Swiss-Prot record:
Cellular compartments annotated: Secreted
Protein name per Swiss-Prot or TrEMBL: Cruzioseptin-9
Example of a GO biological process term: defense response
Tissue specificity note: Expressed by the skin glands.
Amino acid sequence: KRGFLDVITHVGKAVGKAALNAVNEMVNQGEQ
């Protein structure tokens, strides 16, 4: 069962990183 939590944690981190990248892209485009 612990593996299931590991998968959720991994996916959560990946989604969070993707969201941060998207925000950074928007900020960079706004500055140009």
